[in-house]
Amino acid sequence: MSSAPPFAAALAWSGHLRRRLDAHPDLAAWLANACAHPVSANVLAAWQAELSGPDAPEVLPVEQCRGMLRKLRERVFLTLIVRDLGGQADLEEVVGAMTVLADIAVGTAYRSVAAELAAVHGLPREQSTGDPQEMLIVGMGKLGGRELNVSSDIDLVMLYGDEGETDGPRRISNHEFYGRLTRRMMPVLSEVDADGQVFRTDLRLRPDGDAGPLAWSLDALEHYLIGQGREWERYAWLKARLMPAQAFADSNPDAQARQLESLRVPFVYRKYFDFDALAALRALRERIRQDWQRRALARNGVDSANNIKLGDGGIREIEFIVQLSQLIRGGRMPALQRRGLLEALHAERAAGLVPEGDAQKLEAAYRFLRRTEHALQYREDEQTHLLPADPAQRAALAAALGYEPAAFERTLAEHRAFVSQTFRNAFRLAGMGEEDDSPAPARTHANGHAMRPHAGALHDIEERLAGQIQRDFPEHAEDLLRRTETLLGSHRVRSLPDSSRHRLEALLPAALTAATQTSAPMDAALRLFDLIETIAQRSAYLALLAEYPDTLARVARMVAASPWAAQYLTQHPLLLDSLIDWRTLFEPLDFAQVAHQLAADLDACRLPDGEPDIERQMNLMRDVQRQASFQLLAQDLEGELTVEKLADQLSALADLLLAETIRRVWPLVNRRPGAEPHLAVIAYGKLGGKELGYASDLDLVFLFDDDREDAAELYAKLGRRMTSWLSTMTSSGRLYEVDLRLRPDGNAGLLAVSLEAFEQYQRSHAWPWEHQALTRARYAAGDTEAGARFERIRADILVMPRDVQALRGEVLGMRDKISAGHPNRSELFDVKHDRGGMVGVEFVTQYLVLCHAATHRVLVNNLGNIALLRLAGEAGLIPAPLALAAGDAYRTLRRAQHQLRLKGVDKARVPPGQLAAERATVCELWQTVLQDGTIAQAEVK
């Protein structure tokens, strides 16, 4: 037996290693050589070939396969003992080697048994193509996540594509073929003989567990997951991975692999989070807490403190913490859709879901506990997670891991205490509310449907609501009773299943109560009923509002404050669950983080063949835009944002989404490897002036700076695809309406224009109104060099010498056209378009820039109307007091327009006596600057 330094720690701890070296003295030299290199996939492949023999057939006979795999497993296990305990192998090497071993073992056993069966029964074939049909072997749990421990069992689910039968002389159904194949494979892997075993195998994670068939068709799996799939199965399928096993020549399982992934992903990661699922996940957490007790009893009551997997602060709790956020948010954040635990934890940290410090502590705890777990299993090659109770053995374990006993116990206690505390707070950390705010469990009917208080027939709830309405809404009782009758009589409500109807019966009285606590109870009640009717068929949202009273109260306040907000929520109920974590909703938008996470999530939207899933990407961008806008809306309604700050934020969001659109669309149109897009997206209008509203269109111009021969065609195609990407109506709605008419020559012009052509057009062919529009234009997204060149061209155009009188006439003429295009035949004042309104300020500002930018270059900067007026006043171009007063008036007019829009008013108009001082100031500014004698103070309504 060798006692060389690399073996010292391993020999001192592992009785299994000592016995193997005693029984096979020649093994020491081989092991010393093997331990000099990492145990990689290539190393395992070489060992497999060596153990199979130089003349081995491509497919080993079953008995030869059994022996080879057991010897291979022994090599891997012994090498890892020495390398791991000697400090040479990190966690990634250990779990990676065991996972590669499992892939080899399962694939080799499958090929051997399948060949034996096919020799008797023939090949199972696909009905559509006639090609040989493989069995799909799915690795679950740690095998799926490539995280196997060194003495792990493996969880497998066996699937296949088409029903049918084999093509041999003794034909059997495909179903029977795969069932027999599974049954015969298991002993090859798990039966213990003189050489030990390869892996214990567990098939109980298949649908219906031990009561179900050994192999399931994909169609049967789909029906099961849709109709009977439970929350714990979502947890189980999160890591599911199709293993690389192929037995038949000329088979092509790619289509079935894609079908499997198309079933797995939406089952595990739901876009619309089901709040029924939240209760189930809480129950799952309790099961994890109690699981160790059940197993401990089976081991004569071993204290949970010694179980580093199932006990408090153990590995299972870390897995739940990480996977909870994946299950809750992974449907909307594809970057979280990772099988590996550490990969997922890193993604959650990058997404801001787990604080940096907590993520580091969780990873450190996980690595420590997994290494300890492996050391326990190295000792006697047992699947154990129990720390020794004997102090001497405990000290020996610490020494094997490189610790003094006291330091080991201290480190272990610190890690487990942190994990345990984090586990208790898992739902709060996942953004699903405080732990003590969790809803009370629902009572249950005998048929299994959830039952809420006051359950009964619809006419009973109508009677109860009538009494509540007459008491709390006496002045509007008749209208609200009529709306209640309409709601309860609607097809959406009458067709509800029992569970949803019971929830509705609890929700409606609660909604009325919440409405009474708002500033506009009647409006809030009607709008809540509209929202409830819209979401009635989505049980998840009924559950949310029924079981989270604080969230219902927040919704009531929002819809009372703004009918536009009520309509927005009704159109996008996906936003409702963001109201659970109210504090997060009021955090400032971190655009760098939004951009980083969006890019990561879009990168993760892949089809099974690796190509981008464009539909998912487009929907994801729309969902992100809605979520960010809703966050701003919540802050807006609570008075946290000025109109200017809100517009800045909405404009920054649009810039971010434009930049990401270029990145996603460019590879779809460019066929030249490595080429970068030299496109600048120029924002005009509200986006150009950073005055964007919640529902504003984007006025865009596409400019390119690229000398490749096909540039004009390429960038026109890019512009078309970008416009489609932004404005196409998908299942998540439309990102933005896009208006491209401000490009050179308008609708008659090219969709994308070179910078040279743009400059020439602006110098020689542009109308004065196009130069007016240019004052509000800016580079928004795309190639920064092209953007900088545009800004230089813009500045050069704005400082061109102009005939002031001619310009004045053009501006006045364009103002008249604007007025004619927006006639106001009412007695109300149109805040934007009437004389004395916002357009007047904007035209004056544009006129001042075009007249005076040559001598006052500061006016070239796109600073917004208020800042430019102030600069004009400071330069003496207009009276400074008037400049400040006009800026204040413009700010007030914008605020009034914004408030009217939030109230759902289409045209921002107010009574004639309102905003009179602001209108007078704007008219004075107009007369002072443009000397328009036809616009007199007396003409203001």
Swiss-Prot record:
Its cofactor is Mg(2+). One of its GO terms (cellular component) is cytosol. It comes from the Bacteria. Residues 447-941 are annotated as: Adenylyl transferase. Pfam families: GlnD_UR_UTase, GlnE. SUPFAM superfamilies: Nucleotidyltransferase, Nucleotidyltransferase substrate binding subunit/domain. Keywords: ATP-binding, Magnesium, Multifunctional enzyme, Nucleotide-binding, Nucleotidyltransferase, Transferase. Its EC number is 2.7.7.89, 2.7.7.42. One of its GO terms (biological process) is regulation of glutamine family amino acid metabolic process. The keyword Nucleotide-binding applies. InterPro entries: GlnE, GlnE_rpt_dom, NT_sf, PII_UdlTrfase/GS_AdlTrfase. Residues 1-431 are annotated as: Adenylyl removase. GO terms for molecular function: [glutamate-ammonia-ligase] adenylyltransferase activity; [glutamine synthetase]-adenylyl-L-tyrosine phosphorylase activity; ATP binding; magnesium ion binding. It catalyses: [glutamine synthetase]-O(4)-(5'-adenylyl)-L-tyrosine + phosphate = [glutamine synthetase]-L-tyrosine + ADP; [glutamine synthetase]-L-tyrosine + ATP = [glutamine synthetase]-O(4)-(5'-adenylyl)-L-tyrosine + diphosphate. Belongs to the GlnE family. Involved in the regulation of glutamine synthetase GlnA, a key enzyme in the process to assimilate ammonia. When cellular nitrogen levels are high, the C-terminal adenylyl transferase (AT) inactivates GlnA by covalent transfer of an adenylyl group from ATP to specific tyrosine residue of GlnA, thus reducing its activity. Conversely, when nitrogen levels are low, the N-terminal adenylyl removase (AR) activates GlnA by removing the adenylyl group by phosphorolysis, increasing its activity. This is Bifunctional glutamine synthetase adenylyltransferase/adenylyl-removing enzyme.
